[in-house]
A protein has these predicted regions:
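Beta1-alpha1 glycine-rich phosphate/pyrophosphate-binding loop at the start
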Residues: 2-78, 118, 167-190, 330, ...
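Mid-to-C-terminal Rossmann-like scaffold of FAD/NAD(P)H-dependent oxidoreductases
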Residues: 2-3, 8, 286-399, 430-434, ...
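N-terminal Rossmann-fold NAD(P) dinucleotide-binding loop
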Residues: 13, 163-164, 520
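A Rossmann-like FAD-binding core segment of flavoenzymes
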Residues: 26-28, 70, 76-97, 104, ...
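Rossmann-like dinucleotide-binding cores of NAD(P)H-dependent redox enzymes
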Residues: 60, 153-155, 161-219, 301-306, ...
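Glycine-rich dinucleotide-binding loop and its adjacent helix/turn
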Residues: 111-173, 208-209, 269-271, 490-494, ...
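FAD-site-proximal beta/loop scaffold in flavoenzymes
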Residues: 126-150, 227-229, 234-312, 407, ...
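Rhodanese-like catalytic fold shared by cysteine-dependent sulfurtransferases
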Residues: 419-430, 434-460, 465-471, 478-509, ...
Length: 680
């Protein structure tokens, strides 16, 4: 009887074992698992920590007994393979419970070791409570630490899948969270402008972000305080640290056995998952695979590909000619109320190739707008020029966002083009979609671009407009235009365009914009047929504003979060002899009021609070707050250089003060400079 040994369970190894038994009843199959669980839902671990998944047993997909009873497969948990003897086809195994070593022979060996969390040798790492998350015991350790130590603040190092899922689930437990990331964005597999929507969602839910600030060390003080020290030197006080920097392939067994290893440490396999030894196969996070589009080697630590690779190995050992054709990297992650999904190549990756490409953005609803609960989806499609072959897609939005990426992924698997997306037929009913689905819409837009019906410009091209003899027109309503636009734009509403053509210069290149791109498209068709050279801003002002925003500006828009307000006040506070000054400029209502309340909590009796705001609703908010709160005096309320400024102090107002009108102060620039007011 031929013997098959599988090292490692979870996704790839367990799938290979079960599939192999279904195909070959005559094999002796043994699974060796170092940990206490052979097949568990490691993707569910953050949700177990967040108590979304309440019972540990729900994470255990299969047990050794069930494997034996159902598949006649011998699963040995708590057994660590210490070495592979390729010549004699045997493995050395340590039984971790009784510390005995045994040797097992094989005819075929399948490696499914997975990947291990990256833990850099940070200075001071042994002085602070640091955790990684790979398995159920790791999760239990984190949960016990939170409960036993009444954790109030956690710092997550890294903003990838695990970092984001941990941030959400720690917030669900009432823990304040800060993500520290060395790059200028979270989710590095996405392009920056799409990641900005994630930044916004994180900030809105009270997760603080510290981007472009790599961690250099940790330390602890003699009072039990723990600190993360990033390159900026701005220490972060915290109660616990989660390392979510990424993973590296666990390859030490393969290396020691002399198997071929790739430049990034992955085990090299062929399209049938064979290693450099024909009797040894490998699957999962530890292997090097081919990118389906570029045919270049890569590593993709995702559960879906690992399961499929396990099936391929089983087929091959069973005598079938199955082949793994490459990976598209389709993925999805939940970030609070946002679904984030992607497939294929990002623009960042494409810039490293010689492929000629174009991109478009759309913002359709996830289902019919007249049906309650419709939510927008921002969808980016990247495609080859001039063929229209789909190269990648990224989307953020409400429910059903991942469905659109799944459809596009399917089209990509069959080398589909943007013209195929125009014609693709999808199910429709008002609760689930639209007659023109988001997938169709992005196909229409991309096809219009390739056919020359809608030349486009991009959010990052704005600085090139002047040099291109450009004339920028915002075709939204005057009200929308006043709220915000791109610098230098003139406002001609699309409904008035036909009557105001004389205002559009024919000797210039016309650049159009609207909120999401549709109205500007309609305007472009009018102008193009009148002989103008026109381009439309794909994705519209909505994308432009989000893509260009700094983290501080995004935080300002999301200023209702208590955690964001605390950090904002800390950074914007200035102490003078008489005042605590806080500049809450840029925070949207109720952000300035929250900043005021937070500042009053720590205001010394000897000082007054002076707070600046730009939100027009602040005046009414601060007046109402002072009127309802007897322990606070509103001393003055006025304007300084276009900003509202309120002065307050703690203490009960006298009847005379209550009856007296609030004094409105107006000051000149000269007076402000003399008094040394904060920079405005």
């Amino acid at each position: 009887m031929e013997k098959v040994i599988i090292i490692g369970g979870v996704a790839g190894g367990a799938s290979a074992a079960a599939r192999l038994r279904r195909l070959r009843e005559d094999l002796e199959i043994t699974v060796l698992e170092r940990g206490p669980f052979v097949s568990f839902a490691n993707c569910g671990l953050p949700y177990y920590i967040g108590r979304v998944i309440k019972e540990e047993r729900r994470l255990k997909l299969m047990t050794p007994r069930r494997f034996l009873n159902r598949f006649n497969i011998d699963v040995k948990i708590d057994h660590e393979v210490k070495g592979i003897d390729k010549t004699n086809k045997k493995v050395s195994v340590l039984d971790l419970k009784n510390e005995k070593t045994l040797e097992l022979k094989y005819d075929y060996l399948i490696l499914s070791p997975g990947a291990t969390p990256i833990v850099p040798p940070f200075e001071g790492i042994d002085e602070v409570p640091v955790f990684t998350i790979r398995n159920i015991p790791d999760s239990n350790n984190i949960m016990q630490h939170i409960e036993n130590n009444k954790i109030k603040h956690a710092t997550i190092i890294g903003g990838g899948f695990i970092g984001l899922e941990m941030a959400e689930n720690l917030r669900k437990r009432g823990v304040k969270v800060k993500i520290v990331e060395m790059l200028d964005q979270v989710m590095p597999a996405l392009d920056k402008e799409i990641a900005q929507f994630i930044h916004q969602e994180l900030l809105l839910n009270g997760v603080c972000l510290q981007l472009e600030d790599p961690v250099e060390s940790f330390n602890a003080d003699n009072k039990g305080g723990f600190y993360v020290v990033p390159r900026s030197g701005e220490k972060i006080k915290t109660d616990m640290i989660i390392l979510a920097i990424g993973v590296r392939p666990e390859n030490h067994l393969a290396k020691e056995a002399g198997l071929e290893i790739g430049p990034k440490g992955h085990i090299i396999v062929d399209e049938q998952m064979r290693t450099s030894d024909p009797s040894i196969f490998a699957v999962g996070d530890a292997i090097q695979v081919k990118n389906y589009i570029t045919k270049q080697s890569t590593g993709v630590p995702l559960a879906g590909p690992a399961n499929k690779q396990g099936r391929i190995v089983a087929d091959v050992i069973a005598g079938r000619n199955s082949k793994y054709k490459g990976v598209l990297g389709a993925s999805v992650v939940k970030v609070f109320d946002l679904t984030v999904a992607s497939v294929g190549l990002s623009e960042k990756e494409l810039k490293q190739t010689d492929m000629e490409y174009e991109k478009v953005y759309v913002h359709p609803n996830n289902h019919a707008g007249y049906y309650p609960g419709a939510e927008p989806i921002t969808l980016k499609l990247i495609f080859e020029k001039p063929s229209g072959r789909i190269l990648g897609a990224q989307a953020v939005g409400g429910s059903g966002t991942e469905k659109r990426i799944d459809v596009i992924s399917t089209a990509m698997k069959f080398n589909g083009t943007v013209f195929d997306l125009e014609e693709i037929e999808l199910t429709y009913a008002p609760p689930y979609g639209s007659a023109k689905d988001a997938v169709n819409m992005v196909g229409f837009v991309a096809s219009n671009v390739l056919r020359g019906d809608m030349p486009i410009w991009h959010w990052h091209d704005v600085d090139k407009i002047k040099g291109d003899n450009g004339y920028l027109i915002d075709v939204r309503t005057p009200g929308e235009f006043q709220v915000g636009t791109i610098e230098g734009a003139v406002n001609i509403n699309d409904l008035e365009l036909r009557k105001r053509l004389d205002e559009v210069p024919k000797d210039k290149n016309i650049y159009l914009l609207c909120e999401v791109g549709f109205r500007a498209y309609l305007a472009s068709r009018i102008l193009t047929q009148k002989g103008y050279n026109v381009k439309n801003l794909t994705g519209g002002y909505k994308l432009f504003k989000t893509a260009k925003a700094t983290t501080e500006e995004l935080a300002a828009e999301c200023g209702t979060s208590q955690e964001i307000i605390e950090e904002f006040v800390e950074k914007k506070r200035k102490i003078t002899d008489n005042y605590i000054e806080v500049d809450a400029s840029g925070l949207a209502c109720p952000g300035p009021l929250n900043a005021l309340i937070k500042s009053l909590e720590t205001l010394p009796e000897s000082k007054q609070l002076k707070i600046y705001a730009t939100d027009p609703g602040f005046k009414a908010s601060v007046e109402a707050y002072a009127e309802l709160n007897e322990a606070v005096k509103l001393l003055s309320l006025g304007k300084e250089e276009g900003k509202l400024v309120a002065k307050l102090q703690k203490g009960k107002s006298t009847p005379k003060e209550i009856e007296a009108p609030v004094k409105l102060e107006k000051k000149t620039r000269k007076q402000l400079r003399v008094q040394g007011a904060p920079a405005l």
